[in-house]
Amino acid sequence: ILDIPVIIEEQPFVEGKNLDVNQFYEKMANSEELLKTSQPNLADLDNFLMELGEKGYTHVIGLFLSSGISGFWANSQFLIEDHAKLKVAFPDTKITAAPMGAMVRNVLHWSEQGMSFENILKKLEEQVENTTAYILVDDLNHLVKGGRLSNGSAILGNLLSIKPILHFNAE
């Protein structure tokens, strides 16, 4: 629901507004620099929470990128007390990508089943603690662009067809 701008060669793009999926992958492949993201606008979240309260919602669960890779989760915590009409929870997902999407689907499913807010948060916490992800780095040049790997190591790794597998867990 909140836009996360992608910065490509110092120009901001937002998926679905001024960038589609095909353009994204093309720009990523052709970029000299690693693509960066900026945090969603905190004012947008504040406005969204106000709109939800005005529409009669009473409970809100927000799932954002892991606090380990984005400062948005920590910043979002300041808004919780500003919306006294809402019971708001922004748990740290400690993950991103597909596992976070699964969390969103599960929260929606549990809500549609009529599960209480507290039980949803408890089940979500269990899911967060038990979620791990493996990411295959198909192109070592992305690690070079991000400063995680030297050019020499990338050349050698590419010659040997090395594809690192990164493991993410709740820690």
Q: What residues fall within each predicted segment?
A:
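N-terminal glycine-rich anion-binding loops that anchor highly charged ligand groups
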Residues: 1-3, 10-26
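A short, well-structured juxtamembrane/interface segment
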Residues: 40-52
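Phosphate/nucleotide-donor binding subsite
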Residues: 18-41
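Mixed-charge interfacial surface used for oligomerization/domain docking
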Residues: 1-11, 31-35, 50, 55, ...
